[in-house]
Amino acid sequence: MRRTSSGRFTVFLIDDDQGTLDTLNSLLRAVGYETKAYTAPQPFLDEHDPAVHGCTLLDLSMPGLNGLDVQQELVRRGIDRPIIFLTESDSVLARVEAFKAGAIDFLIKPAKEAELLSAIRAAVKRDSERLHSYAVAKRVDTLTPRERQVLALVVRGVSNKNIAVALGIREKSIEVNRSRAMKKLGAKNVSELVRMTKKLATESKLS
């Protein structure tokens, strides 16, 4: 079974053509991916779990909700799992809208096997980063208000002495709060902490 550091990778297949789903299922399972197939978008949306490591392989033209509608609904829910469009439509407007909303690829049926697998490998990498960000964001939620205050200044490069002055507490207290917060976040040093928070764009959450 294909795995990454974040665990098993599942490709969610959404297409109203059963033959297409069968072909994709066979191909992707043969190379080691898990798959879950849907002939309509709504059941996928109803049971969607953003904590699952995976990507969505999505048709554009379907009865009811189309692929762009599904993408917009996921965006509305704040779910940024990678999306790859696989469609017969080569609409420039649809392509632009899909990429503007965060799609990582827009493939035209019948896509070459190598092209499809390359897009999914890119999705594996992207979603590993997403889940890492998700995990660290959950750790941020465990910080105390004081730890958040201290870290918000640490990641901006403010010295312990100046943080102590700004917060009206002793420098020793700054060191203790910084050490506790770094342990909670899993950061080995300040440089790693800064990289982590910048990548996650969580400085505003720490403020």
Per-region residue spans from a language model:
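C-terminal output helix
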Residues: S91-L93, A111-I120, N162, A166
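Receiver (REC) domain active-site loop signature in two-component systems and cognate sites
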Residues: M62
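Active-site residues of response regulator receiver
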Residues: D59, T87
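Acidic catalytic/metal-coordinating carboxylates
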Residues: T39-A40, N66-D69
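Active-site beta3 strand of CheY-like receiver
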Residues: A51-L57
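Short amphipathic alpha-helix used as the core "switch/output" element in two-component signaling
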Residues: L68-I79
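Basic, Lys/Arg-enriched C-terminal extension of HTH/homeodomain DNA-binding domains
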Residues: S179-S207
